[in-house]
A protein has these predicted regions:
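Hydrophobic faces of well-ordered beta-strands that scaffold small-molecule active sites
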Residues: 1-3, 32-36, 74-79
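Short helix-capping and hinge/turn segments at secondary-structure transitions, especially at repeat
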Residues: 1-2, 7, 14
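Active-site beta-loop-alpha junctions enriched in small/polar residues
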Residues: 6-10, 37-41, 79-83
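Gly/Pro-rich active-site loop or hairpin
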Residues: 11-72
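C-terminal helical cap(s) of enzyme catalytic domains, especially alpha/beta-barrels
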Residues: 84-98
């Protein structure tokens, strides 16, 4: 299955759920792909949303843990499209983690 880290964080933020507890209840041993980006928070509503922001260090370290703990993961997708320089930097950083 595909685990979208930002979607999980958005759900946890908006529903006030502990992220680690939520994540640990998923069948991550069946995950083959991870989507990587950082979520945003809407200023008016205060709700989190999948903003496809540049993946921050917290997200990258979480990805590193997931890759280490779940050997079924084969594919990583950085969901960031705003500028090529930051996309290249995030791809380089992800490669360093694996």
């Amino acid at each position: 299955f595909l685990f979208d880290l930002s979607h999980a964080r958005v759900t946890c933020y908006n529903k006030n759920i502990n992220f680690d507890r939520y994540k640990n209840n998923l069948p991550l041993d069946r995950a083959i792909q991870l989507h990587i980006c950082t979520f945003g928070i809407d200023k008016e509503s205060g709700l989190a949303y999948d903003a496809h922001n540049y993946p921050n260090e917290e997200e990258l370290l979480e990805i590193q843990k997931l890759i280490k703990n779940y050997k079924s993961i084969e594919y990583l997708t950085v969901e960031y499209y705003r500028d090529i320089e930051n996309l290249e930097a995030s791809l380089k950083r992800v490669r360093e983690l694996v």
